[in-house]
């Protein structure tokens, strides 16, 4: 039992990751239901029964949840959570021997937790139920055919915490691209992830600590920040510093 939170800004592959996480659960041995907005495009997951609400028919997300609970599901999932009342009821279900998986728009794993606290989830309840908060971003990969080597300037080395001897060259996008990447200088995308979980984090969630303290607690539990994961891809030539700056200046959705 417990609560799993998935988050990202818009257009960061969140729907795909949500499907993967839910599909990885042992749904053949458990009954899962999803709470879905009837106005949204259907996106069904095998062996997960959708229960839909429709504001045009005066049914609310909580109405759909109550209907779903009549089936005594072991798991409940919902995407792009925005309804405060539904959020509270879902966390209560996570506290009552059910696995709850939700997704919402947030810039990182800690912001997702603070958003739940901010909409009125009792801190001790959230701390008791939180299994983990997983955040992701999608970054474009440099085209392997036309990417260029360059000597990073001192300010970039300082940002990467490297010396010139440790990092004599980096990769960047080719100026004109090539036929392989259709002139874009990038080819394909990859995801970077950040997982906030652990006893230290839950201890400070219960205290409703500020985001900086929560991030420090999560780091002690082993969380590697998204930016750190992104810089790892810069160092190994998978992507460029310019791409990381583009990704991390994008605003999170609300």
For each predicted feature, which ranges?
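Short, flexible helix-loop junctions that flank or precede catalytic/ligand sites
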Residues: 1-254
